[in-house]
């Protein structure tokens, strides 16, 4: 399960950006073609957050649909796996244009009143 290491890296990046301020929420974008299982990230998140500024934070995951573009005719198509055939011309020469992402889209930190 490579999602454990990925989750640890996400938490390290967010904690570094938070600069010691407690984090309330983290939003990720995960592409359906990324080979990263969103449910596994959710499972690892609470465990990996323990003892960090992310402890108690909520995790929101936005799944990005897979899309491809035919290199022969330019048609854009939905992809549910990292390969397929063009709906228009039948070509297998597809370029993945969306769905392989893994992004930390945003994080929400607690307000600090001074």
Curated annotation (Swiss-Prot):
Biological process terms in GO annotation: protein maturation; protein modification process
InterPro entries: Hydgase_Ni_incorp_HypA/HybF_CS, HypA/HybF
Keyword Metal-binding: yes
Pfam families linked: HypA (PF01155)
Listed GO MF terms: nickel cation binding; zinc ion binding
Protein task: Involved in the maturation of [NiFe] hydrogenases. Required for nickel insertion into the metal center of the hydrogenase.
Family note: Belongs to the HypA/HybF family.
Full protein name: Hydrogenase maturation factor HypA
Higher taxonomy: Bacteria, Bacillati, Cyanobacteriota, Cyanophyceae, Oscillatoriophycideae
